[in-house]
């Protein structure tokens, strides 16, 4: 039963990491470049709507789950006496936490909070600088999320290959 629980946690963690990597990737390669062509007023209105819509229960569960489930998978692996697997999940979880969750909380969210107060009819003079900083941080979290997803896929494939 322990091994089954550890396996299920590792699969769910991997899926959540993949969903979030895809979410950030789609925004980085499609949405952000499209929005770079908008004037200040259109950009502010669009980004404000995106920020309103993205705050929902489904996204919240996926976003917070992707930060917590790798750590749960690590604990489950340690519980099954799979020290190396546990350490690998711990590394994935910590890298993801720092490069996605922490970065989001310290860079993207403060910019989103400031942007929520802006008036589209009278944008601040530094709106493009804030947009570029947000996009730079999003690009970093995109790469980190993709790397963590790939690491999780490899980890699940390697560990399942050894147990079958």
Model features per residue range: what roles?
Residues 8, 17-64, 110-132:
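Interfacial loop at the N-terminal end of multi-pass membrane proteins
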Residues 2-18, 75-99:
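Interfacial segments of alpha-helical transmembrane regions
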Residues 91-113:
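Hydrophobic alpha-helical transmembrane segments of integral membrane proteins
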Residues 18, 71, 98, 150-153:
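Hydrophobic residues within the alpha-helical transmembrane core of Major Facilitator Superfamily
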Residues 57-73, 131-148:
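Hydrophobic alpha-helical transmembrane segments
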Residues 11, 52, 91, 132, ...:
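Internal alpha-helical transmembrane segments of multi-pass membrane proteins, especially GPCRs
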Residues 158-164:
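Short, charged juxtamembrane terminal tails flanking transmembrane helices
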